[in-house]
Amino acid sequence: MWFRFLLAALAIFFAGRYLSDLADETADITGLSKGFIGALILGLITSLPELIGTLTAVLFRANTDLGVGNIFGSNLFNIAILAGAVLVFATRIKPGDWIHGSLFTVHMSICVAAFMVMLIHLLRGPSTGWWENLGSITILGFFTAGMWLYSREKSAASVASTKKGQRSLAVNIILIVILGSVVVAAGILLADSCDDIAKNTHMTATFVGSLFMAMATSFPELVVTIRLLEHGNIRMATGNIFGSNLFNLCIIAFVDLMYRGTIFSNVTGPQTVLLATSILMSGLFLIGATIRALRKTSIRLDNIIILVLYLCIYFWLY
């Protein structure tokens, strides 16, 4: 089971390596904002492991703890990735890049996560009827409307401004589909192996899902974020991370619509703490980004606090 876990994790890691270049080229070809490309294309593709893993765990393995833990744990790990990468590549990021449309996804992910905390408490207990899925429908509608508004932001580049040496849009789409297929297959294998790990060890499904499975499914975000920040591209990096987090929360809403009853009634206390912690970490990142946009500062206390919070929450969970 550990061999299958490592095999799936490596497949996700290497497939994710090439996604940032494809997304960057796609942004230049289409003329769409790089923050939007980061949030939509990168967010969607890098969230494929979470989607497939959670669907497999909840619907086919009947392991809600593993599936929900995977999503909430992935969101925590994603924010920790961004905080750590900002610390490492701080000198390559221009102060003026902090306030940009990419922070739109930070606000959206905070709103959806807070609404989800409310749903968890409102829907706790026995089934109360068809209307209990209205919360998930609201989340998906909010996401769709938000992405439509976000797509209105255009970059100065023209649609026809393909640089010499770039692949065509059609080739990029084909490559994204191929890499996405690899990630899907690896996500299924990953969910199966993590379910076996949880059943054959003394670790809980929530812990396995929110740590091991979450870290493995977040490898694309890890690779993409590092490669983007190596070039100081904080806009796409932020759009990628919080776009992925937003997609992840929508995965819970999507699975809820296919789940018998409501998945929110089965969310445990520790999982709710993970979700609430992601809201806190997102808020800290947003505060730090706002301060850096207003004045140049070398203080990175917000990122350090985020990383400490991440370590403390898993020490508590274990």
Q: Which residues are covered by each model-predicted region?
A:
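Hydrophobic alpha-helical segments, chiefly the membrane-spanning helices
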Residues: M1-Y318
